[in-house]
Swiss-Prot record:
InterPro entries: MobA-like_NTP_Trfase, Molybde_CF_guanTrfase, Nucleotide-diphossugar_trans. Its EC number is 2.7.7.77. Keywords: Cytoplasm, GTP-binding, Magnesium, Metal-binding, Molybdenum cofactor biosynthesis, Nucleotide-binding, Transferase. One of its GO terms (biological process) is Mo-molybdopterin cofactor biosynthetic process. Transfers a GMP moiety from GTP to Mo-molybdopterin (Mo-MPT) cofactor (Moco or molybdenum cofactor) to form Mo-molybdopterin guanine dinucleotide (Mo-MGD) cofactor. It catalyses: Mo-molybdopterin + GTP + H(+) = Mo-molybdopterin guanine dinucleotide + diphosphate. It is an enzyme of class 2 (transferase). GTP binds at L10, C11, G12, K22, D73, D102. Pfam families: NTP_transf_3. One of its GO terms (molecular function) is GTP binding. The N-terminal domain determines nucleotide recognition and specific binding, while the C-terminal domain determines the specific binding to the target protein. This is Probable molybdenum cofactor guanylyltransferase.
Length: 197
C-alpha cells in the first residue's frame, strides 16, 4: 500500500452558528486555518484547502503557506460532501485524510496514527472513519479516491450527509480514542462560547 500523502481541510461553510468564517477564527493570535495547515505540512506532502468560492480563496491566499493548494468547490452549495468530491478529484495519491477547519487542536499523534491505519487498511477499505461514543467522525476520516463516483451519485440524489456516504461504502471503523487518547483532535468550535478553552 502506498503512503497517505494527501490531506484536505474543508473550509467552505459560512459558519452561521459561529457568526463568521470558522477558518479565520483566532487561537493564540493565529487563524485556525494557519494553525491546522502548519501542522499538516509537517506530515503530508500534498496539503489542500477546499473553499466555497474565489472570494473566500482570495482571503485565504494571503494567510496560507505557498505549499498549500487552494481549491474551490466544483459543486457549489453541496456542503462538506461537495468539498470531499472536489478534493478527491485533485489529490496526488489514492486517498486523502479530511479534516474540518474548526479543529485546530488536531494532534501529531492523531495524524501519525491515521497514516498508519491507512498503511494497514487502505487496500481493503474505502474509508477509515474514527468512531467515538457519539458515533462516527466522518470529517476526520480518510476517503479513497475510488469513492468519488459514489459521492457524485449521492449528491445527484440531493443526499448531502457525509454519514450517508460512510454507510454507502466499505468503511472501516477505528476507535477515536486509539487515534488520539486526548480526543482533542476531534474538538470542534461551532459557537462563540466554544472558544473559551
Amino acid at each position: 500500500m502506498s503512503e497517505l500523502d494527501s490531506v484536505a481541510v474543508l473550509c467552505g461553510g459560512r459558519g452561521r452558528r459561529m457568526g463568521s468564517d470558522k477558518g479565520l477564527l483566532l487561537m493564540d493570535d493565529r487563524p485556525f486555518i494557519e494553525i491546522i495547515t502548519a501542522k499538516l505540512l509537517g506530515h503530508f506532502s500534498d496539503v489542500l484547502v477546499v473553499l466555497r468560492d474565489t472570494d473566500q480563496a482570495g482571503t485565504y491566499r494571503g494567510i496560507l503557506d505557498d505549499r498549500v493548494r487552494i481549491l474551490t468547490d466544483e459543486l457549489p452549495g453541496a456542503g462538506p460532501l461537495g468539498g470531499i468530491y472536489t478534493a478527491l478529484g485533485n489529490i496526488s495519491g489514492d486517498a486523502a485524510l479530511f479534516l474540518p477547519c474548526d479543529a485546530p487542536l488536531v494532534t501529531d499523534e492523531f495524524l501519525v496514527n491515521m497514516k498508519e491505519c491507512f498503511r494497514r487498511l487502505g487496500d481493503s477499505c474505502d474509508a477509515i472513519v474514527p468512531w467515538g461514543d457519539d458515533g462516527p467522525e466522518p470529517l476526520h476520516a480518510v476517503y479513497s479516491a475510488r469513492v468519488r463516483g459514489t459521492v457524485e451519485a449521492l449528491l445527484s440524489k440531493n443526499k448531502r450527509r457525509v454519514g450517508t456516504l460512510i454507510e454507502s461504502i466499505n468503511s472501516c471503523r477505528i476507535a477515536a480514542i486509539r487515534l488520539d487518547p486526548t480526543l482533542q483532535s476531534f474538538r470542534n468550535f461551532n459557537r462563540p462560547e466554544d472558544l473559551r478553552i
